[in-house]
Amino acid sequence: MSENKKFSFDTITNHLIVSGFIYPGSEIYGGLANSWDYGPLGSTMKNNLKDLWRRHFIKEKKNMYEIDPAIIMNPKTWEATGHVANFHDPLVDCKYCHARFRADKIIKDQYPELDTDGMTTEELNDMIQSGKVVCPTCGKASFTPIRQFQMMFKTFIGVTEEKSSTVYLRPETAQGLFVNFKNVMRTTRSKLPMGIADAGKVFRNEITPGNFTFRTREFEQMEIEFFFKPGEDMKWFEYWKNECLSFVEKLGLREENLRFRDHEPAELAFYSKATTDIEYLFPFGWGELMGIASRTDYDLSRHMEFSKQDLTYLDPEDNTRYVPHVVEPSFGLDRLLLALLCDAYDEEQLEKDTRVVMHLQKGLSPYDVAILPLSNKLSSEAEAKVFNLLAKRFNCTFDVTGSIGKRYRRQDAIGTPYCITFDFDSLEDNKVTVRDRDSMEQVRIAIDELNAYLNEKFGR
C-alpha cells in the first residue's frame, strides 16, 4: 500500500467513477439516490475479494460450507427473528423544511460524546424535543416526535396484494444459514464445530444512506454462522476475532487505519455475550467494516419455536443433546471494497507530472497484467504470443490506444501490478519488457519464462 497520505473523499470517489470502478445507478434516467452500479473494474475486484474471503474462511478450514439461500424467504422467518416487530429506525421530520432524519444519527453528529446506541427511544425523543438538536438542512430546532420506520422492503407473492401474500426482501443473509442448519448437518455428515457461510445481496430501507457505497439500501454481505457446543463461546469468539483481523491485514489495509471497537453492555442484544466491530478510518471518519458477534443459541431456538422443528444436535462424544451456540463473523462486502480502494489511492509527484496510482494487493486488483503492443501493427503478434499464453492463468487486459506512457498511467490508475510491452524487438528475440507498477522498474523477460516469472511474483 501507499504511504498514509490523506486525500479527500470526493477526489477518491471521482476517480472511481471516471475509471470505471463504480457508476451512478440508472444514470441515463437521472440516477436514483444512493444507488450505485459496479463497472467492469469494480465487478472484477468484488469477485476477487469474495474469492479471497472464500479461500481464507472456507476452503482453508475444516467443516466450513458455503450455501446460497433464497433472497425471499417464508415471512415467518422474520417473525421468528423479531425483524417484523423490531427492525425499525427512529425517524423524525423537521417541522420547517420537512427534511427527514434518523434521530440517533443527527444527535450523534451534533453530540459525538453521547452514546446514542445505548439510548432508548424515549431518551432519544427527549433529546430531539429539547431544542438542543438543530435541523442539518435549515438550522431550526423543531421536530416531529420520533416514529419507528420499518427497514425491511415489503413485496407480495402472487397476483394480489393481500396480507397473506406479504413477503420481504431479506435484510441479512444470516437467517438463510440458520434455517438450513439441519439440512447442512444431514447432507455433509459433519460434527460440531461447523460453519455455514454465504455471500449475497441484502436490502435495508435506510432513512439516511450516504457516503458513496458505504451505506446503501442494496448491498452485499459475506457472513458465517459458526456452530459449537455451549460453554465454548468466548474461545470461538476470540478465534474468529483474530481470523477476521488476519484477513483484513492480509488484504493490505494499513494497521493504523484499523481498530477494534468492543460493544458496550448497553449496546449488546440481550442474548449476546460479546460483539466486536472492526472499523476503518475512511476520509469521512471511522466506519464499521465487519462485526464478530456471539449469538448464543438465540436464532436456532427462535426458529425451533416458530417452525416446530427440532434443530438440536446430538453430540456423539458424550451422547448429550443441545441447541448449538453460534459466533457470527459478518463482513460488509461493499464497505470492505471501499476501504481497500481508499487505502490504495495515491498521487505521486514525478519529475514532469503527477501520477495517480492504486497500490492494490496482487490478486485483488481488477487486472493482474496489461499487455501493451508498442504499435498497433504488433497487436496480432502480441495477442497470439503473450495474451493467449497468460490469459489461462492471469486476469489480463489488452490496450493498444495512446502512447506507451499514457497506457502505463492508465494501468497505474486502476491498480494493474504489471504491464508487459511487446515491441518490434520482441519479434526477433522473443522477449518482452515487464514494468512494475509500484517501483516503475522494467526488466526484459523471455516470453516462454513469463508464466514462471509472474507465478513467483504472485506467490502461486
Task: Please describe what each predicted stretch is.
Residues 1-460:
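NTP/phosphate- and nucleic-acid-binding module
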